[in-house]
């Protein structure tokens, strides 16, 4: 146990209402949400206690808290979700209240009950509300009784896969198979036929048992072309309840949200009001008191149907905070302390637009499979306060006088909620999300442009990550137009993400910037080349830049302010910037517009990453370019007759054996990583010649599971 540090001194112990406020709260969670809660508690003058497993001994949330208590091994079922261990930490530290964050014990009524029995406040809703809404079968019945629109489905208990197939066929495909106690995309499968229903039932049941300790499954009709829109509610213990607008969460992968925004580009004020009033009605029906979220699916005609109510703080809560100026964590603490809401429904104004991008430790080039390892480089973009949160004095941990980075527009805000740091480890034991990057702007276009620039400025090395994919989405026509559904990723990237190709104008801007950067590097090389006086190495002005299958001849005319790049076809670009050789981030300006490039060194040029593109850029003299065209490129090894493990994980099941004939799409093996089961399927008809791995084996990336003839 680590004791209180200097940050624990001189904290006030009263609320804004004059009531006595908690002196110390414990956060029963880890990662970015634990850090987020600590920030608001610190602002309120409340001391904080972190809990940590073996894997999190050096984690950021442990360093930020005033005290920290070790609670066990890395596995969550031996540490973070063991109620007795959290209760021991409370007794050791004298914490008066507990914030559960999200996941883990946040929606476990037994945990709320244990806290109540110990006289410790739960910074969340009453046990009864958690029980009622935590069971998806019960919650759907209650929602219907409260006048909330619901999706048709089967709410009874399902005993086995064959019964699941029968029920699915009766409802009519497609269906959604869901864990009754589920959340976070775990224990959920869409089935389009009997075989998928059979497989989906078993996988959902397994994931539900391992993640929630409850393997009950229900099935409901899957609404095709749906949007996922949720309403944020906030209620106190005195019967007051309001809604804080909606969040659009339709950009999802395997039912896991990836990008969220507020407000939704699809809603109109009338529909927003209907959804908000239904959400409030449901909250009041279960005597809700805290922050909570009512999730809906919506079809193209704006018909909406209840999905579930999350009785906790949502991952994506920052976008609501950014457009309303309301600190939801602070409100949760005040409600738990017995305060009456100081905000009425008429006080809620939605100002501007906010977007959140979830940075995941996953490899988009390997179909978004989890990645683990050490963060050898982790440099988020500079945070900058703006908008309602700043106006209301509710922005946390960003100095009022914070200077915007060159790539930022000072009318937009940048916020990064994270739980990691450079040099830290990304573990296989927990959720792969490592940061939530948010931007706010007066309009959706402003927030989008702010996000594009912030993503380009975000430096991450050492693990696979989805930054390129997030950047690609920000420029995708369907996303920029707001014409999105929950099927967006599956529809637009059916074979996974293979990077993007920059359009011609963007490609020329990058080529011009690289030519200017190359001149800076050439001048440096000339100065340290060791040549004799009066025989210095000359830096020419004629260059060829090759990238993305194209090459451009150009002239570089440099001056003190930058360089003018003249292309052979007569087009010119004016380039300036502060890049020096060795910098891994180049903040350039091309024709008056910012251009942020991640820069790596390769032989004869640069590796450039920008706007979702990963480019190998070669800058050569005209003679070098002529010779390069004659050089053959090395081919990658042939792995087409092998099934490779796409991520570090555990082989849960082998579905075939040596000598088996397999068909395209047939399940070959199931690998579990980061609490998710991944079914690996045959890409084509083949015969299994050799099995190289067994059930229970732990595999690394690209380990050979089986071979084919």
Language model features by range: what are they?
Residues 635-709:
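Structured functional modules or segments
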Residues 327, 558-563, 568-585, 589-596, ...:
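Conserved nucleotide-binding/hydrolysis modules and their immediate coupling elements
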Residues 15-294, 298-317, 323:
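N-terminal beta-alpha lobe that positions the nucleotide/phosphoryl donor
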Residues 8-12, 405:
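Short, low-complexity intrinsically disordered segments enriched in A/P/G/S/L with frequent Arg
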Residues 107-114, 356, 366, 591-622:
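Structured, non-catalytic alpha/beta "coupling" segments that mediate domain-domain communication
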